[in-house]
Amino acid sequence: MAENRMLTVFYQKFASYKLQLFSNRSKILGQEKTKQQICDKPRLQIGPIIVAVDTSESMYGQPEKIANSLLIQLVRMAKKQRRKCFLITFSVIAQTMDLAHPANWDKLKDFLDHGFSGGTNGEEMLKIALRVLETETYSLADILIISDFEFSKPIKNTIYKMCEERAMGVRFYGLQIGTASREYDKILDRIWKV
């Protein structure tokens, strides 16, 4: 029992360390997303976050605990920095939760209590993330995918849309639990291995 609690504390501290990438940027406000913007470098603006958590069977067990710890730390950080946060959970189907609304925070606890199972549909998750980017609230959001990345690369049309968003300043990040897959190393802007 004490060992499980210590492991959970370790995951939370480790998650906090890994998530510092979002809190180390300068605050520049009032930047609008336009088609003319071309960005080769990450924005300095601290904006909203879209986080996608892989809830497939391959994430069951220790990866699930790590993913949940990362998510808890990310939500805490978003609240502290007053950043809006949108959650996408994905396995065979994807589910969404807008954590910018405090009423949804209780639903987050329900999510954390469910086990991970099923296959993985990364394509659906990316399509949802791209649709959320079209909203005013989440325009220019950072996208963070927490996964083992054991799913197919996106189709060409999705990669094209990701490139369009990237040209406007959106950045796509990954926190990879395990090191089995390297499929997304060239698709995302940066992947940290956990």
Where are these regions (language model features)?
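Von Willebrand factor
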Residues: 44-101, 106-146, 150-153, 174-183
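A generic secondary-structure signal
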Residues: 73-77, 128-135, 161
